[in-house]
Design a protein with these regions (language model features):
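Fungal secretory targeting signals
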Residues: 1-27
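Short, conserved, GDST-rich strand-edge loop motifs in beta-rich repeat architectures
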Residues: 62-65, 120-134, 187-193, 239-256, ...
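Blade-loop segments of beta-propeller domains
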Residues: 100, 124-191, 213-218
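Blade-level signature of beta-propeller repeat domains, shared across WD40, Kelch, NHL, RCC1
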Residues: 380-413
Length: 413
């Protein structure tokens, strides 16, 4: 939808909030025009806490003294002063496109530096999209050359950036995750029915978008529905998550193999398990130095089977050993609104996660620094070099400017 003009509501500044603002001002970091401080202490005690039927993973939390409109009016939410260095002096958020009820802006966000294009895909398995079993989700792209300074200065710039459908040859079936890889785009395909196996595909970055399958089995066995993919910056090995969202969204068979994280070396052909013990392994990324891996578990969402709030909505951090295996699992963060889907890091090692109300930002220790608040689900997003980010909010496509820089521009191995 196209957002109506929002009326600003001044935040209630007291206690920790006032102290945070005073500290920021003393350091010369005034709160930017599109940012606001959120005082977590102000809602430590609510008095009347809603029952789980009212407040759960699927509901937005509106802090006391704010409204949904005021939260969106100033969408860069500061939970810790470190966030000021991430967003910079003048962060902006711009709506580029809206698709009604069809979730056209879902995942697989990839920025190609040589063309300044950003690729992304439609949601596979969503009833509103009609994709999954009978029709594959599609790949699309935009050119950031169309996002001029005048466009990014607007809050609503719908109609000013063109979205193009990308037709790969042969077709990439139900693409979901993606990353740059060896001057190509590496896609995770979820498969379709029992005969079209989930697979890893590589596609050229330019037309005619030739595609090749590089992996579609483990010793003759299909994967469940490959969800996301990342490259270890130390070794160039491919890591991918395999989960059962294809099954719980009715376009893949029931569990065919354990849900886990896999490691693949395209040069040697070796495929091995990197980690297991998940309910629904989903997003994956690495720290800038490749010594740590982050994996999300979105088990609380079970597709057409509903939800189970006792299942994970968590981000886990691992050490990555010299041999590429994962060890020392640590619970890095738990998400209250929605689930942590796509994850990425900046050059300083801060972790960004697409969640149920926007993009959450954590420092390397797991402290919540701030949010880019959309007010709806962000399945994924991607840095486009320094100071730019494209955000996929299912039926809405956003462009943000900030100070931070993505850790793996191009990520060409």
């Amino acid at each position: 939808m196209v957002h109506a003009r929002r009326t600003s509501l001044a935040p209630l500044l007291s206690g920790v909030t006032a102290l945070l603002l005073a500290t920021a001002t003393a350091q010369g970091n005034n709160v930017p025009a599109q940012a606001q401080v959120i005082n977590q202490k102000s809602f430590n005690v609510l008095g009347d806490v809603p029952p789980p039927t009212v407040a759960n993973y699927s509901t937005l939390f509106i802090p006391p003294g704010t409204t949904k409109d005021s939260l969106f009016e100033k969408p860069f939410h500061i939970y810790d002063e470190e966030f000021l260095d991430i967003i910079g002096a003048n962060p902006t958020l711009t709506l580029l496109k809206s698709s009604g009820t069809n979730p056209m802006f879902h995942e697989a966000a990839v920025w190609v530096p040589s063309t300044d294009d950003v690729f992304f895909v439609q949601n596979a398995g969503d009833p509103a999209a009609g994709t999954g079993l009978n029709r594959s989700a599609i790949i699309q792209r935009i050119s950031l050359s169309q996002v001029t300074a005048d466009v990014s200065a607007e809050r609503n710039a719908t109609g000013k950036v063109d979205v193009h459908v990308v037709v790969a040859t042969p077709a990439i079936i139900n693409p979901n995750g993606a990353t740059n890889y060896r001057n190509r785009i590496l896609f995770a395909g979820e498969g379709q029915g029992s005969r079209v196996a989930p697979a890893l595909y590589v596609m050229s970055q330019n037309a005619p978008y030739n595609a090749t399958v590089i992996l579609d089995n483990y010793f003759g066995r299909q994967f469940n529905s490959i969800n996301d993919v990342a490259i270890n910056p130390r070794t160039g090995d491919i890591y991918f998550t395999d989960t059962t969202y294809g099954y719980v969204q009715d376009f893949r068979p029931e569990n065919v193999i354990q849900k886990q994280v896999w490691r693949f070396n395209e040069t040697s052909g070796a495929v091995a398990v990197a980690a297991d013990g998940f309910n629904m392994p989903n997003g994956i990324t690495f720290s800038p130095d490749g010594h740590h891996a982050y994996v999300t578990d979105t088990g609380v969402i079970q597709g057409f089977f509903g939800r189970n709030s006792s299942f994970p909505s968590s981000i886990y951090r691992y050490d990555v050993e010299e041999d590429g295996t994962f060890s020392n699992r640590k619970t890095f963060a738990f998400i209250a609104t929605g689930v942590p889907d796509g994850v990425h890091v900046d050059t300083k090692g801060n972790l960004y996660a697409g969640c149920g109300d926007g993009v959450h930002v954590y420092n390397p220790s797991g402290k919540l620094l701030g949010k880019i608040w959309i007010g709806s689900t962000v399945a994924n997003f991607q840095f486009a070099g320094k100071g730019r980010m494209v955000i996929l909010a299912e039926t809405e496509l956003y462009y943000a400017t900030l100070k931070a820089e993505g850790a793996f521009p191009g990520q060409l191995y």
